Amino acid sequence: MERDLITGTEEGQSAISWSAIFAGAAAALAASFVMLAVAGGFGLKLAAPWPSPSGGFDNFNPTLGAILAAIQVLSAALGGYLAGRLRTKWVNVHSHEVHFRDTAHGLLVWAVSTVAGAILALTLMVPAAAHMAAPAAAAAAAVQIEPVHAEAIAAQASLFMGVGLLLAGFTAAVAAGLGGLRRDEMHATYWSERARPLP
């Protein structure tokens, strides 16, 4: 009888708090744009800082790749932590299940923010790419980057982006778990203080 009651209570609750997930994803996106703007303000460029033989863009800047990965990790940590702190409290759920749900919220924050960021980037980049197609083609012809070297540059950029995304997903899950743990600790402290008899 008690088991049926607990099962009914759990089924009456949603295991996913979408409002917390969307709030965390929005915070992660906003933090990413702010940090990208700050990095651009400090003069971070896609091209490598050392001179190239052709005088153009034929080297990838590894500093940029590392900073972009760090931006992804930091913004994912912020979004995941917020999702963990803002989610609703689940009643009659084992602590292991609560921890799993918190980390799942972090992964969902990472997934939503990554997809939304990709859509936003494509929306902004496609018109700009169409506008800059002719000048870019002329510049590429002038620089004469070898196709093999261009593929190496693209591979390096993809490597940094992939590593950054993987680290960001892991960080978001861990941060959401920590945020949920902190939320439950504060909730328990609040109610224990209220239940304490007055002197």
Language model: regions and residue ranges:
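Functional transmembrane-helix hotspots
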Residues: 118-140
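Pore-lining and gate-forming transmembrane alpha-helices of multi-pass membrane transport proteins
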Residues: 56-68, 72, 101, 105, ...
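Perimembrane loop-to-helix junctions flanking transmembrane segments
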Residues: 46-61, 141-144
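Membrane-helix interface motif
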Residues: 35-50, 124-132
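Alpha-helical transmembrane segments and their helix-start/interface "positive-inside/aromatic belt" motifs
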Residues: 11-30, 64, 101-115, 174
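Alpha-helical transmembrane segments of integral membrane proteins, especially early/N-terminal helices
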Residues: 22-41, 71-73
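Hydrophobic core segments of alpha-helical transmembrane domains in multi-pass membrane transport
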Residues: 27-36, 113-122, 126, 161-176
